[in-house]
A protein has these predicted regions:
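Catalytic center-proximal scaffold of phosphoryl-transfer enzymes
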Residues: 1-65, 106-511
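An N-terminal low-complexity regulatory-tail signal and nearby short nucleic-acid-interaction modules
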Residues: 64-128
Length: 511
């Protein structure tokens, strides 16, 4: 459908007249008797308000200069090979910028059989919507860190650009649309950090979604629920509200050879254990997806790793938490890519299992027994770090038989012992540490907290799938330190989508 544009007759004027008038107005106010009696915060507020208008007028003048300099063309050819010879001067368009609304004028070329084309739009890379890329980036950065209402309210005190909440939600998806393309093309020098270990890891974290965006099985289970109370959910009735997002990370780390005692800690002079500081993760990338399934995210992990080390010149390791489905998917993807990577079970998860077992033998309310429980956990943990997970599991079973445990506690002991025996190959910590490999998933645990918990759990809201995915992508870009690079890439892709594809070749770039 042909869009309607206002036709304005061209005029000759000094584009910066209004700008100079505004600047003189500010200077005059600063020199006025009233200003002499103002406090510093009142001056600051006035300058901020009037300065925003000055910036808006400067932006308006800059657009006017480009509009007045635009040269009339005999014809413009679109991608449809239709030659547009009908010419219109001064076609207006409203633009919402960080400084407020401005009016943008340009020449249009049309034909009854094709859409109207504006060559100056391509030269200025004008967005498809009325919101400038600067305003979009500002809004996106704010809402990916805080609730939409709070973010928009906070920004309203800093910038003059206005955008409704619904449009802000839509812009999140639009701004994040080039996420995968950005990382697929990103130039990474192979073996950027020679001698380092390439570490991969993934985990899952639930996000509360709207009913229609839950996975089919979860949605069906939610439909079958019957709530006891009308005004609130009872115990156990908050299930089937979330969809699992898969969180992933790839990073480099210097090898860190250590022993079990180094991890557990040697007794210091103050009676507290002292531990060696581990090297920090470098060149870290974290991301998450709630749209893609676990297998697709695992594929992305491999793709990112191959971009970093295509010839497999460095050691690769995969840190896991022991989830059965996770391990099955990882092994399937690795087999498809014909790569062999040692899977390392997160030592922190192992400690959690040991603590579950210890409270079957000790009373947490008794101080002496609680201290004995801590000693027991450290003793078993050191044995596991020394590569003796099998004997530890056997010892736990023997101790359980000697104690008169309840059926519930016996079930806990069986779970812990089976966990250790079923993952023996992933618990060879003595070998892993000797090779300098990491054995804990601190990076991925931090990513789960930063990407998901710190944003999606602050309001208790149910999210739409599209908006949740957009927020995850934007938070991942920022957490990986790629925000500015991504914004530059996104604007270039927008130019290709909105302008280059509409013309028969890049009209202005060819001249």
């Amino acid at each position: 459908m042909q869009k309607a544009y206002t036709k304005v007759e061209p005029t000759t004027f000094d584009e910066f007249t209004a700008t100079r008038d505004q600047l003189e107005r500010v200077i005059s106010r600063l020199r006025s008797p009233e200003a002499s009696n103002q406090r510093h915060d009142e001056l600051e507020s006035m300058i901020h308000q009037e300065g925003q208008e000055l910036c808006r007028l400067l932006y308006q003048a800059g657009l006017d200069v480009r509009s007045n300099e635009e040269v009339k063309r005999e014809a413009v050819t679109g991608h449809d090979n239709v030659v547009r010879t009908y010419y219109r001067e001064g076609c207006e368009r409203q633009i919402e910028s960080m400084f407020g609304e401005v009016i943008y004028r340009r020449k249009g070329y049309s034909h009854p059989q094709g859409e109207c084309l504006f060559p100056l739009d391509e030269a200025l890379n004008m967005p498809k919507r009325k919101y400038t890329y600067g305003l979009r980036a500002c809004i996106s950065l704010a809402v990916c860190q805080n609730a939409f209402d709070a973010s928009l309210e906070g920004l309203s005190t800093l910038i003059e650009g206005k955008i409704p909440k619904r449009q802000a939600q839509e812009l999140v998806s639009e701004v994040s649309t080039d996420f995968e393309a950005f990382y697929a093309q990103r130039a990474i020098t192979p073996v950027q950090l020679p001698g380092t270990v390439l570490v991969m890891s993934q985990d899952g974290k639930g996000i509360a979604l709207r009913h229609e965006d839950l996975r089919e099985a979860t949605r069906k289970a939610a439909q079958q629920e019957h709530h006891t109370l009308c005004t609130r959910l009872s115990t156990g009735e908050k299930r089937n509200r979330k969809r699992m997002a898969t969180v992933a990370t790839v990073y480099d780390v210097a090898p860190h050879v250590r022993s079990a005692v180094d991890v557990i800690g040697r007794q210091g002079e103050d009676g507290k254990p002292s531990r060696k500081d581990a090297p920090k993760a470098q060149n870290k990338r974290v991301w998450a997806s709630i749209e893609a399934d676990m297998e697709r995210v695992t594929e992305q992990i491999v793709e990112e790793s191959l971009r970093r080390d295509p010839k497999r010149e460095r050691p690769w390791v995969m840190l896991v938490d022991g989830h059965k489905d996770q391990i099955k998917v990882i092994k399937r993807v690795f087999k498809r890519h014909a790569i062999k990577v040692p899977l390392i079970l997160d030592f922190i998860h192992v400690l959690e299992y040991l603590w579950r077992a210890t409270w079957c033998f000790f009373d947490s309310k008794d101080k002496e027994q609680a201290q004995a429980a801590e000693h027991w956990v450290l003793e078993k943990a050191q044995a596991i770090l020394e590569g003796r997970s099998g004997p530890v599991a056997a010892g736990i079973r023997i101790k359980a038989k000697r104690c008169a445990l309840s059926a519930k506690k016996q079930e806990v002991i069986a779970t812990v012992a089976n966990y250790l025996t079923n993952h023996t190959a992933m618990l060879r910590y003595d070998q892993f540490m000797q090779q300098g490999y990491p054995i804990a998933t601190g990076v991925i645990e931090g990513a789960c907290r930063h990407l998901i918990a710190d944003r999606f759990e602050i309001t208790g809201a149910r999210w739409s799938l599209k908006t949740a995915e957009g927020i995850l992508r934007l938070r991942a870009i920022r957490a990986s330190g790629d925000w500015d690079r991504y914004q530059a890439f996104h604007k270039k892709q927008e130019w290709k989508r909105n302008h280059l594809q509409r013309f028969h070749g890049p009209v202005l770039a060819a001249e």
